[in-house]
Regions:
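Non-catalytic, conserved peripheral segments adjacent to functional cores
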Residues: 1-106, 125-127, 134-190
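Short, conserved beta-strand edge motifs with alternating hydrophobic and charged residues
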Residues: 84, 112-114
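Ligand-binding loop in jelly-roll beta-barrel domains
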Residues: 108, 115-131
Length: 190
């Protein structure tokens, strides 16, 4: 299992070893012990989620109140996504920066986000199925969003804006600076 950091502290891409033969494949896609050894993150799964998206679906930027926050381990069981990590932690050396990685069922790779990071993804294929392992249960009162099309963040997408499908929640979410001014963003704990 290869675990490499992204440009945002607390985010990583995990690429597992694929064991294949004439019968198919076997993949060990999550190992808490190896993740902790490589990243220092103590990832205790509290909930597993699954979403199925049409091509062009853009979900996020989502984040939870800290504490307790919600670390995520995100992989595709079918299709592919362009996955975004946004540093929304006030005081972080990379505050306001973002990074992305392609996560796909064919590569069996995953992205890991520590508590306090913003997360979004763009489905690159129809029927893209994303599986999330998270460290805290979903709590609607503690969940927030930032508009992923906010110009202050400047996220770049693999598809043109006219092809993006967003929920009403994400479309009406505040921009990055408005969320900061409202005191919604977590504080850097580094």
């Amino acid at each position: 299992m290869d675990i490499r950091p992204l440009a945002i502290p607390g985010s990583f891409v995990v690429t597992p070893k694929i064991h294949g033969d004439d019968r198919g494949e076997f993949v060990e896609w999550f190992r808490a012990d190896l993740l902790k050894k490589a990243t220092g993150l103590d990832f205790s799964v509290a909930q597993a989620n699954l979403s199925v998206s049409a091509k062009g679906t853009l979900r996020g930027i989502h984040f939870a109140d800290v504490p307790p926050g919600q670390a995520k381990y995100v992989m595709c069981s079918s299709g592919s996504i362009e996955d975004y990590v946004v540093d929304i932690r006030v005081g972080s050396p990379t505050f306001g920066a973002w990074d992305r990685a392609i996560i796909s069922a064919s590569e069996r790779n995953a992205i890991v986000l520590d508590v306090g990071l913003g997360h979004a993804f763009l489905a690159l294929e129809d029927n893209t199925t994303v599986t999330y392992l998270v460290t805290d249960q979903f709590k609607p009162h503690a969940e927030h969003a930032i508009n992923p099309l906010d110009e202050d963040l400047g996220l770049k997408f693999a598809l043109p804006a006219r092809e993006l499908l967003l929920s009403e929640k994400d479309t009406s979410a505040p921009g990055f600076l408005a969320a900061q001014a409202a005191g919604l963003l977590p504080t850097w704990q580094g």
